[in-house]
From Swiss-Prot:
The active site is at D781 (proton acceptor). Residues 42-52, 233-244, 320-341, 365-381, 552-572 have a biased composition (Polar residues). It comes from Caenorhabditis elegans. The keyword Signal does not apply. This is Serine/threonine-protein kinase tousled-like 1. It catalyses: L-seryl-[protein] + ATP = O-phospho-L-seryl-[protein] + ADP + H(+); L-threonyl-[protein] + ATP = O-phospho-L-threonyl-[protein] + ADP + H(+). GO terms for cellular component: chromatin; nucleus.
Length: 965
């Protein structure tokens, strides 16, 4: 159906049957009559195949009548267009529906610019909304007949007034938004065109020259066709394009039919009122496929292309025409004349090219669909004059044809794709089966994964429960053992000292028995010593010769064991003042026997004393274990993690390993990795000052950063770091079973040189790793308590831990020898720190701090004591300046130590750090060479000395021989 929108009422004609043509006027029910009525211009279509513009004429009722050609389709009848501005804000107009004989009531937007706005058929379709599918009555127009009560008419006018205000505000807002969007698209298009011209400037110039040549050829033929051109209007309007181009109809009558010379006037009074019945097309009247209109290819109900799609099609068509000039004349195939080709300009400026792409919305045939003209459309049509009211804007004729043709191509392409879909049905079904198989496999894998996850969670819960049960049993056993050993070994008892209470250690009955045995051994030793002294006094005069004595004297001496008194006197004075008798001499054999008995008793006492000392030492070890367990159990019961807490749903806390000043170490189990770990929990005291808190956190974070970057077999690994609360956090470390070296030395006091050499060799290996890094690390707190023994004794591997006081030597490699400033002076363990750390102000330190610590540890392992300040506390060491005055180390006579071990200790304990060896020199020391290599080197040196002596002796003999000659 072809329609032309004018400011007022629009009536559309139905189809015409056979060769006869009927003209009728579709009158809409008028609610506003009286003085507001105006002359209604009428446009009438004759139904011919011409693409001429409508001819405007005067009707008897004062309406303007115009005849319009809509093409040789055989389905379009005469159409009369009636225009008036009396309807106010809301106007209704009929429109043909999908059925040829059915009219659709449309709602038109209010006119713009005082009723002077004109719209193209495509734009008009956007501005209308279908109201119903019922046919409307065909009646004559009579201004004197009122069809509504005045009160109802007043209410209707008020509603229309409010609706008009709302529509005006709404459309103004929509126009502003569309104008903004249009300007944005225009700017983007200008940028793209500028880039396009820059990239393809030579090609564009060549393409522009070709249309100029064609225009010159056409200009020669223009005078011949000027008379025919004057009789035709612009055939590229939306009216002609809607009638011929979209239908793609070939010309059947040998060209364009002649335009009627006089308009056929029609009046509303000559037309009788009648109804249009809904009747479907018969098979005889069915339109062939090649003669169908574009509206028959569109889908009803919102399935047609949108305005943005049409604009995109127009943009694509423009690029295709610009790239291929041969496709431009294709617009004239469907009933167009040569005037269209003459009006085509070979070259358009930028403004015309931008205006040619004004947005067009595809009319929808569905019910209750409304189209709104874009600001671009209103701008074009409002700028035209009234004389060219039936023509499209300049340069828009071909664009409308291209638009309709592109829509036709899109709909035909969709039809071809829909026909090709059954051919690919097998492939689609196959792909669907594959997708279903994959979906089923994914579901199976997800179910298996969820099942495995549930099993894993159940296993974790089982492991957790078993570990808790085992730990509870172990805790109970330790408590029972501690309670049983306390009477025998001892325990802590709270005693009062002045106004304070303190825990004091009290020994058990085992130590009391040890003391009794010691007293008995000492008493027996004293008795044997006195008897031995008396025996020496009775020693015979001639040892080896038997003395001559009477038999009676010998028998008396044997019986009494003493010599007779020489001062025996019967007088009373002699009885009062009696002289002690001299010890009688005993026989030689008796003397030898008594002397042998006393010697054996002394040896027996010595053995008992050794056994007693060993038992006492063993009891001391038990006491250390017992005291340690008592403290550990007390700290464990007072800790907040004694309830088998699960940190971060991963680390199960089992039992406390030890507690320091501001941290505690727990043995835990990692249920994710199934391994035992050590969790070091750092506590920040709430009562500390902010400066102290910041300092502690700084050291803890530095320890974490340093420790996490280390990976060596002789260094404890750090696995994780996690936050517990606002005042505590935890570092997860590698768990090392056994004890530390400090605990082992307390039990054994000293170890052999071989065992000490093995431990020091592993420590030096770890220090070499720390110093080979790009930023060397100083441990600064190396001591026996931070050397862990994996097997619990000195015959196994060791690991270094506790990097809380570590330092990083940043900067260039040349600055590492100068050292870094000591920021934590008087921190650490004083017995193992070098003299430079006690100098005020704080000096610069290097990695040789750890070298001094190695020397002290090696000395303590061999000799059982520290080389400096062994019996002093740390406070006394500071008061007496013990370490500052430690300029030379001395070695006890026992035990015997090799010269290589003593030289190693001297190199480590040099007072000046410049004279002290570094870790790389210690690693190459002869102490760490294999024993066979040392013996070979010693043998080689001895052989060299012998050869030198022999050469010297040979030279001396030669000189002696020469002198004799």
């Amino acid at each position: 159906m072809s329609m032309l929108s004018m400011d007022g009422i629009v009536a559309g004609g139905g189809s015409s049957s056979g060769g006869g043509e009927r003209s009728f006027v579709l009158e809409q029910k008028m609610f506003n009559t009286g003085p507001q009525n105006k002359a209604l211009p009428t446009v009438q279509s004759s139904g011919s195949s011409s693409n001429h513009a409508p001819i405007v004429g005067e009707s008897p009722l004062g309406t303007v009548s115009s005849t319009m050609a809509t093409g040789d389709t055989g389905r379009v009848g005469n159409v009369t267009y009636m225009s008036s501005g009396m309807l106010g804000a809301t106007q209704f107009m009929p429109q043909n529906s999908s059925h040829p004989s059915t009219s659709v009531m449309m709602q038109q937007v209010p006119p713009q610019n005082g009723g002077a706005t004109r719209s193209s058929p495509t734009e008009m379709q956007q501005c209308m909304q279908a109201m119903s599918e019922d046919s409307i009555e065909m009646r004559d127009y009579n201004s004197g007949v009122h069809h509504m009560h005045p009160h109802q008419m007043q209410m209707q006018q008020q509603q229309q007034h409010h609706q008009q205000q709302y529509n005006m505000s709404y459309h103004n807002h929509q126009q502003q938004m569309q104008q903004m969007h249009y300007h944005q698209q225009q700017q983007q298009y200008q940028q793209q065109q500028a880039q396009h011209h820059q990239m393809y400037a030579p090609q564009i110039q060549q393409q522009q020259q070709q249309p100029q040549q064609q225009s010159q050829q056409q200009s020669a033929q223009q005078p011949q066709q000027s008379s025919a051109a004057l009789q035709h209007v612009n055939e590229s309007s939306n009216l002609s394009s809607a009638g011929s181009i979209s239908d793609r109809e070939p010309e059947q009558h040998g060209g364009t039919p002649q335009r009627p010379t006089a308009p056929q006037s029609s009046t509303a009074t000559d037309k009788k009122t009648r109804k249009r019945r809904k009747a479907g097309p018969t098979e005889d009247q069915a339109t062939p496929k090649q003669e169908r209109k574009i509206t028959e290819f569109m889908k009803v109900g919102g399935e047609v292309a949108s305005g943005n799609s049409v604009a995109r099609c127009l943009l694509t068509e423009y690029h295709q025409n610009q790239g291929s000039p041969k496709r431009q004349p294709a617009v004239q195939q469907n009933g167009s004349n040569s005037y269209d080709s003459q009006q085509q300009q070979p070259q358009m400026n930028q403004h015309e090219m931008q205006n040619s792409y004004w947005g067009v919305a595809t009319p929808s045939l569905g019910v209750n669909n409304r189209g709104t003209p874009t600001p671009t459309q209103q701008q074009h049509y409002s700028s035209d004059s009234n004389s060219n009211s039936n023509q499209s804007p300049p340069g828009q004729g071909n664009q409308s044809g291209r638009m309709v043709r592109t829509i036709d191509e899109e709909t035909q392409t969709d039809s071809s794709l829909s026909q090709a879909n059954p051919q690919n049905a097998d492939e689609v079904a196959k792909m669907n089966r594959i997708i279903e198989d994959h979906r089923r496999q994914i579901e199976e894998l997800n179910s298996k994964n969820s099942l495995e996850r549930r099993k894993n969670e159940a296993s974790k819960e089982t492991i957790k429960r078993l570990l808790i049960d085992k730990n509870q049993i172990e805790r109970k056993a330790l408590r029972d053992k501690t309670a049983a050993d306390s009477p025998r070994i001892g325990c802590f008892k709270t005693t009062r000292t002045g106004d304070s209470f303190r825990d004091q250690w009290v020994d058990g009955w085992a130590f009391a028995e040890m003391d009794k045995k010691t007293e008995q051994i000492n008493a027996e030793r004293n008795e044997i010593a006195s008897a031995s002294a008396l025996l020496k006094k009775r020693k015979p005069l001639g040892i080896g010769k038997e003395p001559k004595r009477p038999q009676a004297v010998n028998s008396q001496n044997d019986s009494n064991g003493m010599q007779p008194s020489t001062s025996s006197n019967t007088n009373g004075d002699d009885a009062i003042f009696r002289r002690p008798e001299e010890p009688k001499e005993i026989q030689y054999q008796e003397y030898i026997e008594l002397d042998e008995i006393y010697k054996l008793r002394r040896e027996h006492l010595r053995k008992e004393e050794t056994d007693l000392s060993m038992e006492k030492e063993r009891l001391e070890k038990e006491k250390q274990h017992h005291v340690r367990e008592l403290k550990r159990a007390s700290n464990e019961s007072a800790s907040q993690f004694n309830d088998h807490r699960l940190l971060h749903k991963r680390y199960l806390m089992l039992n406390l390993l030890g507690k320091g000043g501001f941290s505690e170490v727990w043995k835990a189990f990692d249920i994710e990795e199934n391994r035992y770990v050590a969790c070091k929990i750092h506590h920040v005291n709430k009562d500390w000052k902010e400066e102290k808190k910041a300092n502690y956190v700084k050291h803890a974070m530095r320890e974490k950063d340093i420790h996490k970057s280390l990976d060596h077999c002789r260094i404890v690994k750090q696995y994780d770091l996690l936050t517990i609360d606002n005042h505590s956090f935890c570092t997860v470390l590698e768990y090392v079973p056994g004890n530390d070296l400090d605990f082992y030395l307390k039990q054994n006091r000293s170890i052999s040189e071989k065992e000490a050499r093995s431990i020091i060799m592993q420590v030096v290996s770890a220090l070499v790793y720390l110093n080979e890094k790009s930023t060397p690390i100083i441990h600064y707190d190396l001591k026996p308590a931070n050397i862990l023994l994996e097997s619990g004794n000195t015959s196994g591997a060791i690991k270094i831990t506790d990097f809380g006081l570590s330092k990083i030597m940043e900067g260039e490699s040349d600055d590492h020898d100068l050292g870094i400033e000591l920021t934590s002076q008087f921190a650490g363990t004083y017995w193992y720190l070098p003299p430079e750390t006690f100098i005020v102000p704080p000096p610069k330190i290097t990695c040789k701090v750890d070298v001094w610590s190695i020397g002290v540890i090696f000395y303590q392992c061999i000799y059982g004591k520290k080389p400096f300040g062994n019996d002093l506390t740390q406070q006394k060491i500071l008061e007496y300046n013990t370490i500052i005055n430690a300029r030379e180390v001395s070695f006890p006579s026992k035990p015997q130590v090799s010269s290589a071990a003593q030289d190693f200790i001297r190199r480590c304990l040099q007072y000046r750090k410049e004279d002290r060896a570094d870790v790389f020199e210690l690693a190459k020391h002869e102490l760490f060479r294999p024993r066979g290599a040392i013996r070979a080197s010693v043998a080689g040196s001895l052989l060299l000395v012998i050869i030198t002596l022999c050469q010297h002796s040979n030279r001396s003999e030669d000189r002696l021989c020469v002198s004799n000659v």
